[in-house]
Amino acid sequence: MEHNIAEISVSSLTDPHFLRENKNLFIPDTDPPLSKIETINALSELSIGSSQEIQNPDHKTYSKLGFGKPLFTRADRHYVDPPLSNQDVGLISFVPCNDAKPNKYGVYGFAKIRGTFANVDESDQRASELIQKHDSVHKIYHVKVGTPFPIVHPKISSQYAASVKEIDVKADAKNEISRFVKTAGEEDKKVMEELKEREKQLREDVSKTPEQKLNELTPLDQYIYARKRLSDNLFVFEEHRKKLHDVKKVILQAELEADSLEKTNPEVINQYKEKYEKAAKEAGIDKSTDAMAVMIKENFYNKPNLQKIFSENLV
């Protein structure tokens, strides 16, 4: 089934393959954080399975923000959530249902781990912060760490969060996991055999020096290896040379600006030196002998001889 890019809402969870094919990009929204009323409405729709009902502190019902206006502004302001202290790597296991189908790239969809928390109060607080300030587009599901939970279509997610009596989540999870374990058994055995063979090869290789390994190669393999090193390092060399010339342009432009200011405002020279000497003394640069301090004293206090530097050091 072909999709029209105009019909699909692009967000931070949109498949990158789809965006590339349609020459589109995720552009973060710049809308301001949600208001108090908008946050209340957004939480009731987007915070799925929260431990507490979303209460309106004013005890008012807000069905609309105004005539014809939505209940809240839907904005996706960041591709990556603001970081949480001591939370950098997440663990997740996923088993697709028997009739679930990935796209042509083998992708079932995209998800974000929004954080793990010590208690429900902290998780509610983080969900509220994300929805109000960063992402009022995607639903946020509150789940128990280590316990299987279904990944369902957003339109029916409330059914799973509302009552386990209506939908037996545990039974669904048990059946799907059992099916997956059974079908994965042969694949696991094959992988283990490959790992053992690879381990054996590594143990044989670890005792050999790089020279010994190179000498064991055929002349053709040695030639290929040499040409690859030549090509790879030449690419790195060219990239650095381009950057070097870009930096040179910036340096020369800065010199022109400094020369122009010296001519139009000659008093800035002495004022600059006085300010530098004071700052250098406070930072201890005037007495320091390390390479960075010497460079600062040579190139910051006195104007460097660019003609000499560029003639000697540029490749």
UniProtKB/Swiss-Prot annotation:
Residues 184-212, 238-275 form a coiled coil. Keywords: Coiled coil. Belongs to the IIV-6 287R family. This is Uncharacterized protein 287R. It comes from Invertebrate iridescent virus 6 (IIV-6).
